[in-house]
């Protein structure tokens, strides 16, 4: 029987919590926006971790790229801090990726709202 909650998922969840605190407390770069860790995917061999982030209130591609650059530059430092806080034999290399799912979700919600409003408008016109 397969495990419902694998070791890599547990490591990813713990890394997500730890990284959220470490980025907030340890990264002192004033250019860094309000970063939210939306998920961490750890490879099966625990050598690499994809860290998905969003940046609060910054949809500008240039600002997002700057935040990604800052985090990727600090990846080694964050990895060292993770090694101290987590009891792992080897700490995965961190690879930061921008999570566009929230932006896409907001766009889809706006499209649905527009479609519903248009249907209501057409429904009101046909009743007249």
From Swiss-Prot:
Main location: cytoplasm
GO CC, alphabetical: cytosol
Pfam name, any one: RBFA
Alphabetized UniProt keyword annotations: Cytoplasm, Ribosome biogenesis
GO biological processes: maturation of SSU-rRNA
Top-rank taxon: Bacteria
Localization, UniProt: Cytoplasm
A GO term for molecular function: ribosomal small subunit binding
Record InterPro entries: KH_dom-like_a/b (IPR015946), RbfA (IPR000238), RbfA_dom_sf (IPR023799), Ribosome-bd_factorA_CS (IPR020053)
Keyword Cytoplasm: yes
Oligomeric form and interacting partners: Monomer. Binds 30S ribosomal subunits, but not 50S ribosomal subunits or 70S ribosomes.
Protein family (similarity comment): Belongs to the RbfA family.
Record's function text: One of several proteins that assist in the late maturation steps of the functional core of the 30S ribosomal subunit. Associates with free 30S ribosomal subunits (but not with 30S subunits that are part of 70S ribosomes or polysomes). Required for efficient processing of 16S rRNA. May interact with the 5'-terminal helix region of 16S rRNA.
Name of the protein: Ribosome-binding factor A
């Amino acid at each position: 029987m397969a495990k419902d909650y694998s070791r890599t998922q547990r490591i990813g969840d713990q890394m997500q919590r730890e990284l959220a605190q470490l980025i907030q407390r340890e990264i002192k770069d004033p250019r860094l926006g309000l970063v939210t860790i939306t998920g961490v995917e750890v490879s099966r061999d625990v050598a690499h971790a994809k860290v998905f982030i969003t940046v609060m209130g910054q949809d500008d591609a240039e600002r997002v790229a700057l935040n990604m650059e800052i985090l990727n530059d600090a990846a080694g430092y964050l990895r060292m801090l993770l090694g101290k806080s987590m009891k792992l034999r080897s700490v995965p290399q961190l690879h930061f990726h921008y999570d566009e799912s929230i932006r896409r979700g907001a766009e889809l919600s706006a499209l649905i709202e527009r479609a519903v409003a248009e249907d209501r408008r057409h429904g009101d016109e046909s009743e007249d």
